[in-house]
From Swiss-Prot:
SUPFAM superfamilies: EF-Tu/eEF-1alpha/eIF2-gamma C-terminal domain, P-loop containing nucleoside triphosphate hydrolases, Translation proteins. It comes from the Bacteria. GTP hydrolase that promotes the GTP-dependent binding of aminoacyl-tRNA to the A-site of ribosomes during protein biosynthesis. This is Elongation factor Tu. The gene is tuf. Mg(2+) binds at T26. Its EC number is 3.6.5.3. The keyword Protein biosynthesis applies. Residues 138-141 are annotated as: G4. GTP binds at residues 19-26, 83-87, 138-141. Belongs to the TRAFAC class translation factor GTPase superfamily. Classic translation factor GTPase family. EF-Tu/EF-1A subfamily. Residues 10-209 form the tr-type G domain. It is found in: Cytoplasm. It catalyses: GTP + H2O = GDP + phosphate + H(+).
Length: 399
């Protein structure tokens, strides 16, 4: 059977369910899928949630994360939806960016209100730059007192506000269980609540800026010389687009240099332009083989700058995940793998933190021995002797 062609007719948006472990994230994911299947059967497959694809995912950094992926469409948009069933999986996914979210549905049980993990998830969403959160107040069928539901709603709005999210976001009162089971009391009412939730997601979560519209950036993977023509750098374009005869900067490791791209090739075919996702060779005017190296980036002039000192948020692998067997302390000197290269860095733990244990989710300062083209949100792996021992992202550039 031929694979269906991916129709790019509707805007594509990545969302996810976040929140405390027993508050009904996975049930809500199932309910959304079922309600949309019934409303738009042509574009939404019927999922068997016992078989939902929750295969472990190897993040690029060599960490196993259990993520369930489903896709569905509303009238306006095509969604990819991630649900991380386990709390540790959620933390790892957020920090590694294995499944990035353009917005999130925070699921809070009206029976419990916000719990410790609810708070941790909201904080993490803020730290990793999830732009918008809206709320599904779940299990409303189990609370008779409307005032109690309103108190919980107020508490959730306060929590969002404290973490820099919009306290006036949509909050939908729902029962995922009631919408999922045809024989549940008030079934139609709860089905409507899921439709209301998705209408709110359509309107409230912004369509992401496509990678093509961002400034051009290509990490250099390899450098070689073509006799009589000059130096070619190869790599996969991370974002943006680039036309022939455009000036670019080479950033990182050494002082920044400016040059012009005189030819663009992919798999030995010349192109007028390349864009995000292309595997490309760029011919650079006036630079020798020894002037550029793996680990630098080719970028639109002025769009990215080299830095050596940053604050990072890191998930430290456990022994079972192939990580360290023992804690580390300030002045630990592992390698930090950014895009295509390792750079040694010195870790300084925050005041009052004596050590970091395998399995911890930690924030600390790093000073690299060489500058790297860096911006907030950039992900990296922490490696020791070629093995990944942690995975993180830059939360703040310091120098």
């Amino acid at each position: 059977m031929a694979k269906e062609k991916y129709e790019r007719t509707k805007p594509h948006v990545n969302i996810g369910t976040i929140g405390h472990v027993d508050h009904g994230k996975t049930t809500l994911t199932a309910a959304i899928s079922k309600v949309l299947h019934e409303e738009f059967p042509d574009v939404n497959p019927e999922y068997d949630f016992n078989q939902i694809d929750s295969a472990p995912e190897e993040a690029a950094r060599g960490i196993t994360i259990n993520i369930a992926h489903i896709e569905y469409q509303t009238e306006k948009r095509h969604y990819a939806h991630v649900d991380c069933p386990g709390h540790a999986d959620f933390v790892k996914n957020m920090i590694t960016g294995a499944a990035q979210m353009d917005g999130a549905i925070l699921v809070v049980a009206a029976t419990d209100g916000p719990m410790a993990q609810t708070r941790e998830h909201v904080l993490l969403a803020r730290q990793v730059g999830v732009p918008k959160i809206l709320v599904a107040l779940n299990k409303c069928d189990m609370v008779d007192d409307e005032e109690l539901i309103e108190l919980v709603e107020e508490e959730v709005r306060d929590l969002l506000d404290e973490n820099g999210f919009d306290r006036d976001c949509p909050v939908i009162h729902t029962s995922a269980y009631g919408a999922l089971h045809d024989d549940a009391p008030d079934h139609e009412k709860w089905v409507q609540s899921v439709k209301d939730l998705m209408a709110a997601v359509d309107d409230y979560i912004p369509t992401p800026v496509h990678d093509l519209d961002k400034p051009f950036l290509m990490p250099i993977e390899d450098v070689f010389t073509i006799s009589g023509r000059g130096t070619v750098v190869t790599g996969r374009v991370e974002r943006g687009q680039l036309a022939v005869n455009t000036p670019v900067e080479i950033v990182g490791i050494r002082p920044t240099q400016t040059t012009t791209v005189t030819s663009i090739e992919t798999f030995h075919k010349t192109m007028d332009a390349c864009e995000a996702g292309d595997n490309t060779g760029l011919l650079l005017r006036g630079l020798g083989r020894e002037d550029v190296e793996r680990g630098q980036v080719v970028a639109k002039p002025g769009s990215v700058t080299p830095h050596t000192k940053f604050e990072g948020e890191v998930y430290v692998l456990t022994k079972d995940e192939g990580g360290r067997h023992s804690p580390f302390f300030s002045n630990y000197r592992p390698q930090f793998y950014f895009r295509t290269t390792d750079v040694t860095g010195v870790i300084e733990l925050p005041e009052g933190v004596e050590m970091v244990q395998p399995g911890d989710h930690a924030t600390f300062t790093v000073e690299l021995i060489q500058p790297i083209a860096m911006e907030e949100g950039l992900t990296f792996a922490v490696r020791e002797g070629g093995h990944t021992v942690g995975s993180g992202r830059v939360t703040k550039i310091l120098a």
